[in-house]
Amino acid sequence: MPAVAQEKFIVVASTTSTEDSGLFKHLLPLFKANSGIDARVVAQGTGQALATAKKGDADVVFVHDRVAEQKFVDEGFGIERREVMYNDFVVVGPIADPVKISGSKDVIGALKKIAASQSPFTSRGDRSGTHAAELRYWKLAGIDPQTGKGSWYRETGSGMGPTLNTASAMGAYAFTDRGTWLSFKNRGDLVIVVEGDTKLFNQYGVMLVNPAKHPHVKSELGVQFIDWLTSAEGQAAIAAYKIEGQQLFFPNYKKAS
């Protein structure tokens, strides 16, 4: 079938949050209608997504760990990096809130209380951008959560959805991006307990896998995707994605001067 042979597609290694939140189901048909290019997503934690791209198994990377992204660029694996959008992280926990942190805007103080009381906490433990952020906050709190591993601190080794399922089943606290939380249906008794701390800002970046490292990378098609995401149309499409009236991601691409 000639139509199949001629189909234009790229592989996008991306975070589970952009997939689990439903953002890609909203964006990708719009991009395809605009360009004729099918973007096929491999949804993994940020660490795994960057590893996939490093091997040349993706054309574009769309992730949220600024430090890991910069390292990827510095090592020559990524080019054309642009900041696309942001949302924020929140801490969720059982409505009974045994640690009494509900309504707090202090993520560090909340984590200290969780650790001091040894209240159950579920972590992704999967080298994702969300996991990396969670570990940064534990470090800022002066706590090594690994000391609680096997007792109050439990790593699922999986994506945000399964980790929230585990937290819901255990009545545990968890750290999540707001986008996945808003689209997550199986909340049980879980509610947001900590939000609004400026430290919880969560930036997403997109970049092309460097064709100088992997000549088979579809750089022209990949750049079209990046250009669309950062265009007025793409940015408006990101802003338009809502669940129950709540915007999940906020476009913030700024053209380099």
Named regions from a protein language model:
Residues 5-43, 47, 51-57, 66, ...:
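Exported/periplasmic ABC-transporter solute-binding proteins
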Residues 60-86:
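Acidic, polar ligand-binding/catalytic clefts
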Residues 91:
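Serine endopeptidase catalytic core focused on the charge-relay Asp
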Residues 56, 87-88:
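Short, conserved active-site loops that position catalytic residues or coordinate cofactors/metal ions
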